[in-house]
Amino acid sequence: MALQTREARTLAEKVWDDHVVVSGRNEAPDLIYIDLHQVHEVTSPQAFDGLRLAGRPVRRPDLTIATEDHNVPTVDIDKPIADPVSRTQVETLRRNCAEFGIRLHPMGDVEQGIVHVVGPQLGLTQPGMTIVCGDSHTSTHGAFGALAMGIGTSEVEHVLATQTLPLWPFKTMAVNVDGQLPAGVSAKDIILALIAKIGTGGGQGHVIEYQGSAIESLSMEGRMTICNMSIEAGARAGMVAPDETTYEYLRNRPHAPTGAQWDAALGYWQQLRTDPGAVFDTEVHLDAAELSPFVTWGTNPGQGVPLCATVPDPELIGDDGERQAAEKALAYMDLEPGKAMRDIAVDAVFVGSCTNGRIEDLRVVAEVLRGRKVAPGVRMLIVPGSMRVRAQAEKEGLGEVFTVAGAEWRQAGCSMCLGMNPDQLAPGERCAATSNRNFEGRQGKGGRTHLVSPAVAAATAVRGTLSAPADLN
């Protein structure tokens, strides 16, 4: 696939240009070809109903893959799903996939898991692709240099029917993170610090490209974490240019090209970089050396501070809207200004989600938990992002580390990231979570969520208060 030639384009612009079927010439949306469509049980039922009513087939079932993730339990997966709504959604997905000829990985399948973990581990996610799913965190796949975005149910139907999507071109943003990350600081801390800096609307209307030496030094898992939470910064998508780290991750994956096809793909992938002199609509800079473990205190991902800080005082916030939002958040979170973040006790710790449910994340958690115990009164759930991640963790002995420490080692699924399955907080319970959203009630009605990295989650489970691994020494 040869790239179109034009002077000084960004990575996002290159991928976009290569997928324009019909140009709207700025008077209408461009019609964009979609390379991979991922489907799950929550946002697809009405889309399939629309196809059925119109008598349409799925245009490219071979470019469509489905998995069960949002509503599935993470224990007793061999038993019927207890919640009737969840059970209906899962059963409906199975019927729809069978009727329309779509590949499905159901509960119990070795490839089942969170859709944004399954795609990369199978090698379905590749540089230069356009990828969509009826899920906002589709941006995860941008870590591979793909243009990946969440879409609504009506758009899901459009892609199923045509393998295309009408889209207006996006603005572009460069986030430059240079320098060396201090020990104990991770990709999750980078993205939480960025969102605190630019706000949850800072990236609105943009595709963010993450650049700089700190980004280049990250593993693919770390890059996926950052691209995943681009949505919490208000962006439409996040991207990282592919490099040797990307290629080595993809090599020998089940759906990665091989032989001459690998060589051809690699030649294309190596062109997927922002050209020198390309102009971004917005640029943001972070100094990696100045970052430290980061946590949220409020009810949106932008309400965060370094772990070493205190709960902020709304009276010191100049903007009226932000001050009122902070006051409301502190009331919901039951926190007082000036309280040290490290003194905030938790009832639960959740490790998992499409943000931090991969094998690298579990290794970090195991390293902290090894030889230690979860604090009395704290419940810790560790949920792999896929069954293959779980199998790898078992092979490495991580599952035993988790259970010996007193954590609950679960099956794959979205779990406590959102209150759509049995894994939920009780009203008033406080949780340190490696997921991506801390909205009111996100983890269950009345639940209080602090977003953290896997390392901070593990240390918090041991101490019982928000903590970093360094606090355990």
Curated annotation (Swiss-Prot):
Pfam families named among the record's database cross-references: Aconitase
CDD domains the UniProt entry points to: IPMI (cd01583)
Keyword flag Amino-acid biosynthesis: yes
Keywords, in A-Z order: 4Fe-4S, Amino-acid biosynthesis, Branched-chain amino acid biosynthesis, Iron, Iron-sulfur, Leucine biosynthesis, Lyase, Metal-binding
Pathway(s) where this gene product acts: Amino-acid biosynthesis; L-leucine biosynthesis; L-leucine from 3-methyl-2-oxobutanoate: step 2/4
One GO molecular-function entry: metal ion binding
Residues binding [4Fe-4S] cluster: C354, C414, C417
Cofactor note: Binds 1 [4Fe-4S] cluster per subunit.
The UniProt record lists the keyword Iron-sulfur: yes
Any Gene Ontology biological process: L-leucine biosynthetic process
EC number(s) reported in the record: 4.2.1.33
InterPro entries: 3-IsopropMal_deHydase_lsu, Acnase/IPM_dHydase_lsu_aba_1/3, Acoase/IPM_deHydtase_lsu_aba, Aconitase_4Fe-4S_BS, Aconitase_4Fe-4S_dom, IPM_dehydratase_rel_enz, IPMI_cat
Top-level taxon of origin: Bacteria
Catalytic activity: (2R,3S)-3-isopropylmalate = (2S)-2-isopropylmalate
Cofactor field: [4Fe-4S] cluster
The family this protein is said to belong to: Belongs to the aconitase/IPM isomerase family. LeuC type 1 subfamily.
Role played: Catalyzes the isomerization between 2-isopropylmalate and 3-isopropylmalate, via the formation of 2-isopropylmaleate.
Subunit composition and interactions: Heterodimer of LeuC and LeuD.
Protein name (database record): 3-isopropylmalate dehydratase large subunit
